[in-house]
């Protein structure tokens, strides 16, 4: 262990220096007449940015109906990321990226724009010309090119800082001290088992004199049964208690469950699925984050599935998998049912957190002389 520390520590310092150089000369561009809220993290791997962005969209759609909403994303691994694009629908994840496609599918009336150069992509593709406009910058904490009015940083309660070291010695994308740039921190995936880790992380922030307010959140998980005959974008959803009563997920009525996923934190997906079903899932295949499922790979998954087994995957994976006609036809042919794990964020300190969000809107309106227009 000591050998690896000695080997990688200089590389970790070099990474920090190169990161500092890359950020030093950037002067953030102020997007005209919009309220910009960034959702980001400081670690590699999944912290729950996608469901948290969706939580914010739901909140603002419910509480600030006069506001138009834009989700601005890089579109990681998307074919059109380099040139930038605006999404018309969520049916082409290979062009626009899996998370942006998932956002557009879930919120058809929300403007979703992708681009490696997010500033230029927004200026080119934005079709909203109202001052009542909220832009949510997805994975934006390290993206200093765009000025943001508020920075929300997510920390996974299972391991907020990893080993406390930056890449490649650890999982941090930048040092813990950089959290001073954040306006608030939200610990995600909180459970009774990892609560102590979040408390220790808060103490570390206090020791480092980082006076950033923090909140906690957990996931509300559900399963959605896919109708393989229609493949509608809004499949029938069953509450957890109803799912447990169906023959489909009755352990006596099938030969088990097979989970496949390509996300940043597959272990947490597995634990979530097991908590919904109420039993252990022994069959699973994990793929790299943003994995593009080919028909051959999906065919090999079907080859491992016994008759009566229920397939499980995530919303992020389903956005891509549903376009594979050969796979879907084989599922129908073999009468294999597939369920999608649906995740929603619940902020534990809901009243305080939503009061903060309401304050952001009020401050923005006062700053831009919009109060009289309400």
UniProtKB/Swiss-Prot annotation:
PANTHER family: TETRAACYLDISACCHARIDE 4'-KINASE, TETRAACYLDISACCHARIDE 4'-KINASE, MITOCHONDRIAL-RELATED. Its EC number is 2.7.1.130. Transfers the gamma-phosphate of ATP to the 4'-position of a tetraacyldisaccharide 1-phosphate intermediate (termed DS-1-P) to form tetraacyldisaccharide 1,4'-bis-phosphate (lipid IVA). It is an enzyme of class 2 (transferase). Keywords: ATP-binding, Kinase, Lipid A biosynthesis, Lipid biosynthesis, Lipid metabolism, Nucleotide-binding, Transferase. Belongs to the LpxK family. One of its GO terms (molecular function) is tetraacyldisaccharide 4'-kinase activity. GO terms for cellular component: plasma membrane. It comes from Leptospira biflexa serovar Patoc (strain Patoc 1 / ATCC 23582 / Paris). GO terms for biological process: lipid A biosynthetic process; lipopolysaccharide core region biosynthetic process. This is Tetraacyldisaccharide 4'-kinase. It catalyses: a lipid A disaccharide + ATP = a lipid IVA + ADP + H(+). The lineage of its organism: Bacteria, Pseudomonadati, Spirochaetota, Spirochaetia, Leptospirales. It comes from the Bacteria. ATP binds at residues 43-50. InterPro entries: LpxK.
């Amino acid at each position: 262990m000591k050998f690896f520390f000695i080997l990688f520590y200089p590389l970790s310092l070099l990474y920090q220096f190169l990161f500092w150089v890359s950020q030093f000369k950037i002067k953030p561009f102020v997007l005209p007449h919009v309220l910009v809220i960034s959702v980001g993290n400081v670690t590699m791997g999944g912290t729950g940015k996608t469901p948290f962005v969706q939580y914010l969209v739901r909140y603002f759609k419910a509480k600030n109906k006069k506001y138009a909403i834009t989700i601005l994303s890089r579109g990681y691994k998307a074919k059109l990321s380099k040139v930038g694009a605006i999404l018309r629908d969520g049916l082409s994840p290979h062009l626009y990226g899996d998370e942006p496609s998932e956002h557009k599918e879930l919120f058809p009336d929300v403007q979703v724009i992708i681009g490696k150069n997010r500033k230029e992509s927004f200026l080119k593709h934005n079709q909203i010309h109202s001052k009542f406009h909220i832009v949510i910058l997805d994975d934006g904490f390290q993206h200093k090119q765009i000025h943001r009015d508020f920075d929300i940083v997510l920390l996974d309660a299972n391991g907020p800082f990893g080993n406390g070291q930056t890449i490649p010695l650890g999982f941090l994308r930048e040092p813990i001290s950089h959290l001073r740039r954040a306006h608030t921190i939200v610990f995600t995936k909180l459970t009774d088992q990892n609560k102590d880790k979040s408390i220790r992380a808060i103490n570390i922030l206090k020791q480092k004199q980082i006076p950033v307010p923090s909140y906690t959140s957990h996931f509300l998980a559900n399963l959605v049964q896919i109708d393989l005959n229609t493949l509608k974008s809004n499949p029938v959803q069953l509450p957890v208690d109803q799912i447990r009563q169906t023959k489909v997920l009755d352990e006596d009525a099938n030969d088990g469950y097979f989970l496949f996923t390509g996300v940043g934190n597959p272990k947490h997906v597995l634990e979530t699925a097991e908590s919904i079903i109420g039993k252990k899932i022994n069959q699973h295949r994990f793929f790299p984050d943003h994995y593009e499922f080919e028909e051959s790979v999906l065919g090999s998954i079907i080859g491992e599935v016994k008759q009566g087994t229920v397939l499980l995957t995530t919303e992020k994976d389903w956005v891509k998998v549903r376009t594979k006609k050969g796979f879907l036809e084989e599922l129908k042919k073999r009468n294999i049912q597939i369920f999608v794990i649906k995740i929603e964020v619940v902020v534990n300190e809901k009243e305080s957190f939503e009061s903060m969000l309401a304050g952001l809107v009020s401050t923005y309106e006062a700053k831009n002389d919009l109060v009289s227009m309400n």
